[in-house]
A protein has these predicted regions:
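Conserved N-terminal segment of class I S-adenosyl-L-methionine
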Residues: 1-97, 101-103, 117-120, 208-211, ...
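S-adenosyl-L-methionine-dependent methyltransferase catalytic module, highlighting the catalytic core
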Residues: 14-26, 85, 101-103, 111-128, ...
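Conserved sequence/active-site signature of Rossmann-fold short-chain dehydrogenase/reductase
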Residues: 107
Length: 222
């Protein structure tokens, strides 16, 4: 969830940009099946900007936390997920080196570069050495014309740029896919789980506009 929730009595961000759609659950089932090999199922996991909680609902992990500043969205979450209702810029109430995975989807573009660095520093703190940061992100290189249609987007990232950003902060890149998912789910693309799984199995994914990066925390990163 962006850190720019309406303060003037207007509609909340999610109602404008991403109203709840139960069909997304089947999409996220397929996405989580694809991402599960990078997620340690016997360790803790944190989802950043969890929104409707689709990822944390479907992914397998020993214990799951989800950070979201809009507390009204928690009603959609699985009961197995521990909510952290706060800004990502505030200290996270999680112990050092206590998690195996931190996940963020469509998240970092809502922050300045400096804020993103602060968030990544917190992610490094809570991950154990060798723990993974998984990021799904709009790819400005593939979707420059629509990237700023979302009025809360602050920073433009390409797949190469975000990889270099992570490397500059000490992360090691374990896996990267410049063309991972379509730019948005706000269209008439099929949402059946088997179709999404078929799409993810394609060597070239048409209409892809988001990238996937999996980074690992080296032992030297605090």
């Amino acid at each position: 969830m962006p850190e720019t929730e309406t303060k003037t009595g207007g509609l909340p961000y999610h109602e404008i940009r991403f109203p709840y759609d139960p069909r997304r659950r089947s999409v996220w089932k397929a996405i989580c099946r694809y991402l599960q090999p990078w997620v340690a199922s016997d360790e803790g996991l944190l989802e950043l900007g969890a929104g409707y909680g689709e990822f944390s609902r479907e992914i397998c992990a020993a214990r799951k936390w989800a950070l979201e500043q809009n507390g009204a969205l928690v009603q959609h979450w699985a009961v197995s997920v521990t909510p952290l209702i706060q800004s990502a810029m505030d200290p996270w109430p999680l112990a050092d080196r206590s998690l195996g995975t931190v996940f963020a989807s469509n998240f970092f573009e809502h922050f300045t570069l400096e804020q993103g660095e602060e968030i990544l520093t917190q992610a490094a703190r809570v991950l154990r050495p060798g723990g993974r940061l998984i990021v799904v992100q709009p790819n400005f290189r593939l979707e420059p014309r629509r990237y700023f249609d979302d009025y809360t987007h602050r920073t433009a990232y390409t797949d190469n740029g975000f990889r270099d950003f992570l490397r500059a902060l000490g992360w090691e890149i374990a896996h990267a896919e410049p063309r991972f998912l379509p730019f948005t789910m706000k269209n008439r693309l099929p949402t059946a789980e088997w179709l999404v799984r078929t799409y993810l199995a394609l060597p070239f994914r048409p209409r892809a506009g988001q990238f996937l990066i999996v980074a690992e925390k080296p032992g030297s990163l605090k």
